[in-house]
Curated annotation (Swiss-Prot):
Catalytic activity: N(6)-acetyl-L-lysyl-[histone] + H2O = L-lysyl-[histone] + acetate; N(6)-acetyl-L-lysyl-[protein] + H2O = L-lysyl-[protein] + acetate; N(6)-(2E)-butenoyl-L-lysyl-[protein] + H2O = (2E)-2-butenoate + L-lysyl-[protein]; N(6)-[(S)-lactoyl]-L-lysyl-[protein] + H2O = (S)-lactate + L-lysyl-[protein]
CDD domains, alphabetized: HDAC1
Sequence positions bearing N6-acetyllysine: K74, K220
Protein name per Swiss-Prot or TrEMBL: Histone deacetylase 1
Residues with S-nitrosocysteine modification: C261, C273
Taxonomic classification: Eukaryota, Metazoa, Chordata, Craniata, Vertebrata
Active-site annotation: H141
Cross-link (Glycyl lysine isopeptide (Lys-Gly) (interchain with G-Cter in SUMO)): K444, K476
Length: 482
């Protein structure tokens, strides 16, 4: 499979400003606020100018029940902190209450997370983007009829089901420290989805992901698990990730990839026990991207939230093929990043319990399993089902050039590299002084000038100003409805 280094690819990004308002409860390690921190940091790095930004639709119950059971989704829609006493039996049945608490807006949170992932899949299917990013997604532990590991609705499974409408084979890769059990379980008996998970194994949540778990029935050999021990570092991780993924690509030949970028595999994570730096983690993104396949990048775990924001901001830059400085720009959460206020983190001095012998032994066992695969299974031709999200209306080319563009349209536009330069005050990598960046008036063709008598009149400076683009800062929190 062809690999390319440093190829610029079109990126779209899903974010809803409300996502940071949801709160799992006091002392709970899962903090949706980290998504807002990530968004704010990448805004202040100026990355928003290089990609299309969309606000996800809220996925409805019908979309969710493409995988989840009806009664489970009905329960999630109904349960609230003030009526929990009425649902005590169902809470037990659906594993809601402790790790997966009931909180205000629980179902809306699931709708946003799922909406972004499903909309991303539709965008990729329509070839309207090369890479889609939804940091609010990646909730890989949720089961068909059960919440698990802080996850309620499995947005990944729903996004993959959407991709399967257009793609014969979809590859799922999971670099979260926890095993991607919910996704593996959903596709355990099919040969159209291969799941590959690199995770901590042995007396660690969720307890699954043994090397010998390889799939069943038609899906035999289509589940790949790389069990790891504490303290794995960048060098060891790269030494296993690249050869395993190269072999998987060669044997499975997917036409789309979903990458779950859980950042709890970073050094210093509140719940994790690996020793990866942000650069080491992002090398996985870079390597998968080099295969030049339609790619969905999702969030997942990550409980030292300042490092989550650092990691996902940097990985957004990697997707955009953009270098960003190590010096963090000033942002709304600047004090979180002290005392160094730098983007990158250093590894700790913890011992890497993954010896070269251990890693090599596991790698060879996985290679043996991968050799059992028939090369790229075929799929019977069928009519393509309807998309989960209706076609967007409106053609940009038909917009009236004399009308000020909406903020939604502004967010969707990607700035040319030459269109902006840093203001003197900000320096490299800083936010731009929006008053310095105005869009030139559209130049009319000779034919249009002939038809438009007004064009022959002299246009005053004041009239020109009305044609100018809205200020760049308007993009900050207003994002396009997907």
């Amino acid at each position: 499979m062809a690999q390319t280094q440093g190829t610029k690819r079109k990126v779209c990004y899903y974010y809803d400003g409300d996502v940071g308002n949801y709160y799992y409860g006091q002392g709970h390690p899962m903090k949706p606020h980290r998504i807002r921190m990530t968004h704010n940091l990448l805004l202040n790095y100026g990355l928003y100018r290089k990609m299309e930004i969309y606000r996800p639709h809220k996925a409805n119950a019908e979309e969710m029940t493409k995988y989840h059971s009806d009664d489970y989704i009905k329960f999630l829609r109904s349960i609230r902190p003030d009526n929990m006493s009425e649902y005590s039996k169902q809470m037990q049945r659906f594993n809601v209450g402790e790790d997966c608490p009931v909180f205000d807006g629980l179902f809306e949170f699931c709708q946003l997370s799922t909406g972004g992932s499903v909309a991303s899949a539709v965008k990729l299917n329509k070839q309207q983007t090369d890479i889609a990013v939804n940091w609010a997604g990646g909730l890989h532990h949720a089961k068909k009829s059960e919440a698990s590991g802080f996850c309620y609705v499995n947005d990944i499974v729903l996004a993959i089901l959407e991709l399967l409408k257009y793609h014969q084979r979809v590859l799922y890769i999971d670099i979260d420290i926890h095993h991607g059990d919910g996704v593996e379980e959903a596709f355990y008996t099919t040969d159209r989805v291969m799941t590959v998970s690199f995770h901590k194994y042995g007396e660690y949540f969720p307890g699954t992901g043994d090397l010998r778990d390889i799939g069943a029935g038609k899906g035999k050999y289509y589940a790949v698990n790389y069990p790891l021990r504490d303290g794995i570092d960048d060098e060891s991780y790269e030494a296993i990730f690249k050869p395993v993924m190269s072999k998987v690509m060669e044997m499975f030949q997917p036409s789309a990839v979903v990458l779950q970028c859980g950042s709890d595999s970073l050094s210093g994570d509140r719940l994790g026990c690996f020793n990866l730096t942000i650069k080491g983690h992002a090398k996985c993104v870079e390597f998968v991207k080099s295969f030049n396949l339609p790619m969905l990048m999702l969030g997942g775990g990550g409980y030292t939230i300042r490092n989550v924001a650092r990691c996902w901001t940097y990985e957004t830059a990697v997707a955009l093929d953009t270098e960003i400085p190590n010096e963090l720009p000033y942002n709304d959460y600047f004090e979180y990043f002290g005392p160094d206020f730098k983007l990158h983190i250093s590894p700790s001095n913890m011992t890497n319990q993954n010896t070269n012998e251990y890693l090599e032994k596991i790698k060879q066992r996985l290679f043996e399993n991968l050799r059992m695969l028939p090369h790229a299974p075929g799929v019977q031709m069928q009519a393509i089902p309807e998309d989960a999200i209706p076609e967007e209306s409106g053609d940009e080319d038909e917009e009236d050039p004399d009308k000020r563009i909406s903020i939604c349209s502004s967010d969707k536009r990607i700035a040319c590299e030459e269109e902006f330069s840093d203001s003197d005050e900000e320096g490299e990598g800083g936010r731009k002084n929006s008053s310095n960046f105005k869009k030139a008036k559209r130049v009319k063709t000779e034919d249009e000038k002939e038809k438009d008598p007004e064009e022959k009149k002299e246009v005053t400076e004041e009239e020109k100003t009305k044609e100018e683009k809205p200020e760049a800062k308007g993009v900050k929190e207003e994002v396009k409805m997907a």
